[in-house]
């Protein structure tokens, strides 16, 4: 299961930019991987884990802007189609439960 976070935050004032930076660093520190500029994803094992992550995001949300969370299964995530560009291979993109490295 994957938790995908989409956000659109204002960056007009220095305070806005600071809030953006703090939120982005929080996501990275929490184990999220950048998919696109404002789209981050994280692998979760179950719904309980997902719920705790969402609560943590709510606790660390910036004061302004839009933050959305979408949860998809690994099978759904693996079926994502790339229309243009290349997928980063820094992480595995599979729905297999056992991965041998």
UniProtKB/Swiss-Prot annotation:
It comes from Treponema denticola (strain ATCC 35405 / DSM 14222 / CIP 103919 / JCM 8153 / KCTC 15104). The gene is cas2. GO terms for biological process: defense response to virus; maintenance of CRISPR repeat elements. The keyword Ion transport does not apply. Its EC number is 3.1.-.-. HAMAP family: Cas2. Its cofactor is Mg(2+). This is CRISPR-associated endoribonuclease Cas2. Keywords: Antiviral defense, Endonuclease, Hydrolase, Magnesium, Metal-binding, Nuclease. Belongs to the CRISPR-associated endoribonuclease Cas2 protein family.
